[in-house]
């Protein structure tokens, strides 16, 4: 387990990018699959049904779950594939691409495509589909991949099995963007706005039917591009919120529960469940609008808030992980090797001093922060956060809203920032992580402004064009120090992706970057 003490002493073996030139020669997803099933004798056949208490956040936007944007959940790799994939160590690997290279500053990227890949309808996947998919994802109106919309200027075919991305600005870490959960490859159409609604992908399973607010059914793709994969005949998924997850598991309805509630771990184990937990997972970022006349416009109040939160208590009480990492008030994740811990974990006396200096010697009551319980433990988590802040004289209510319609609600006023709220933050590479508090993101910095913000943006652009990993590391540390000093938002940290499965299921693995797993090509069941 990677804990805070290891981060502070530098003794942990920490996940990271490695040397950039290796990106183009990275081992493929096939190597990962082969290594995972090495020395096993997988059984062919069987049906696996999973329950997932965490629906796709975009379900309220469309009932057309055949499109990867609106699938039942965001773990879409069973039906679709992307050009690249991020492995369990957060290293990027080729998926439908076989290699990728860039010019010196990372402003132009060329991808070579895997040959002989077939869509579920029998059409071969070529550069026509890859270019059209990329343009769909980058489209200003209907595109759903924010990093494409920020960075992709245009996309060009390079023969039948290649494409070229021309970016708006350099980004030496761009292959991570082509692994995003919405960046799936779809069948090209003349009108790219119409793409994706047929449910046709290149993944190991073919979609049979879907009600994206309830369940989906899929069957084995006999023409999958990994020979002999998958092993299962059918894969089905069901949204299983609240007690439905544990009840469905104990009754035998579900073989697997993805994103299991940590408060139910003991019940799952008593029912014979086997747990798998990733090193980290999605996290919670508090968006604090600073463009309105609110008390936290004063940086001293924001610093006091951060110092008052008992993050180790969250890890201990909610996750039973007392030595887990804690948020550093950036979008960085504890498993990033570039992660820089806050110099002080918690200091109630300093929090009170800052409040008094800001004109609140008797404490302060702050505007409510809204959340929806995307993850089942959230109501308990925010209770711990709120109670710990009271010790410093800070009263802050965390108000629960339904997840269906949550985004329209929080974004309905004070555009483009919206209401005070918590946003979900997936574990990503450092450039994408740190871009979320920059001028590339209109909401999550919360209206952060001033010299620190300008310097932060300059450093982000510099890091994106820097091919030397050591130099990028120094830049990323400087950026994190700026954010920790000005606290544009607050990161809780410590959460880990987990799943539970029955004893007869093999190779079900939770992934730090939630949407990259499980790799169903590796999964098989005993008779």
Regions found by a protein language model. Name each.
Residues 323-357, 374-380:
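Structural transition elements
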Residues 223-267, 395:
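Ligand-site clamp/hinge motif
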Residues 74-77, 86-91, 171, 179-234, ...:
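Gly/Pro-rich hinge or "lid" segments in bacterial periplasmic/extracellular proteins
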Residues 112, 146-187:
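Surface-exposed binding/hinge segments that line
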Residues 50, 122, 255-259, 387-442, ...:
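Periplasmic binding protein-like
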């Amino acid at each position: 387990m990677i804990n805070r003490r290891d981060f502070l002493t530098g003794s942990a073996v920490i996940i990271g990018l490695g040397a950039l030139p290796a990106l183009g020669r990275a081992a493929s997803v096939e190597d990962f699959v082969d290594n995972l099933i090495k020395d096993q004798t997988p059984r062919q056949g069987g049906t696996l049904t999973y329950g997932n208490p965490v629906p796709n956040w975009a379900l309220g936007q469309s009932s057309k779950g055949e499109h990867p944007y609106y699938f039942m959940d965001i773990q879409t790799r069973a039906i679709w594939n992307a050009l690249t994939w991020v492995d369990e160590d957060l290293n990027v690997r080729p998926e439908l691409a076989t290699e990728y290279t860039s010019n010196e500053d990372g402003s132009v990227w060329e991808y070579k495509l895997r040959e002989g890949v077939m869509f579920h309808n029998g059409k071969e996947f070529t550069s026509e589909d890859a270019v059209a998919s990329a343009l769909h994802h980058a489209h200003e109106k209907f595109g759903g991949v924010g990093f494409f919309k920020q960075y992709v200027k245009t996309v060009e075919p390079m023969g039948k099995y290649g494409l070229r991305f021309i970016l708006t600005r350099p980004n030496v870490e761009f292959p991570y963007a082509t692994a995003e959960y919405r960046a799936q490859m779809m069948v090209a159409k003349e009108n790219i706005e119409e793409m994706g609604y047929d449910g046709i992908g290149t993944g190991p399973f073919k979609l049979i039917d879907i009600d994206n607010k309830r369940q989906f059914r899929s069957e084995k793709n006999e023409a999958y591009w990994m020979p002999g994969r998958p092993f299962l005949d059918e894969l089905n998924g069901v949204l299983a919120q609240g007690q439905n997850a544990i009840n469905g598991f104990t009754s035998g309805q579900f073989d697997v529960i993805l994103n299991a509630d940590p408060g139910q771990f003991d019940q799952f184990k008593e029912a014979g469940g086997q747990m798998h937990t990733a090193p980290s997972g999605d996290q919670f970022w508090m968006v604090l609008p600073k463009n309105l006349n609110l008390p936290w416009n004063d940086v001293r109040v924001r610093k006091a808030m951060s110092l008052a939160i008992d993050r180790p208590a969250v890890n201990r009480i909610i996750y039973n992980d007392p030595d887990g990492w804690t948020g550093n008030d950036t979008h960085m994740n504890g498993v990033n090797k570039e992660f820089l811990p806050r110099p002080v974990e918690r200091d109630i006396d300093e929090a009170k001093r800052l409040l008094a200096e800001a004109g609140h010697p008797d404490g302060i009551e702050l505007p409510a922060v809204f959340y929806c319980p995307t993850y089942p433990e959230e109501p308990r988590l925010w209770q711990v956060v709120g109670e710990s802040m009271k010790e410093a004289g800070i009263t802050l209510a965390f108000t629960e809203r339904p997840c269906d319609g949550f985004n329209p609600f929080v974004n309905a006023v004070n555009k483009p920032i919206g209401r005070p709220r918590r946003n979900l933050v997936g574990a990503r590479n450092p450039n994408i992580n740190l871009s979320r508090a920059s001028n590339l993101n209109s909401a999550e910095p919360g209206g952060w402004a001033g010299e620190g913000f300008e310097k932060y943006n300059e450093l982000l652009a510099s890091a994106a064009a820097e091919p030397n990993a050591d130099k990028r590391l120094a830049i990323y540390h400087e950026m994190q120090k700026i954010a920790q000093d000005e606290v544009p938002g607050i990161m809780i940290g410590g959460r880990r992706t987990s799943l539970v499965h029955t004893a007869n299921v093999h190779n079900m693995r939770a992934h730090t970057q939630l949407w990259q797993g499980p790799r169903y090509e590796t999964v098989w069941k005993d008779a």
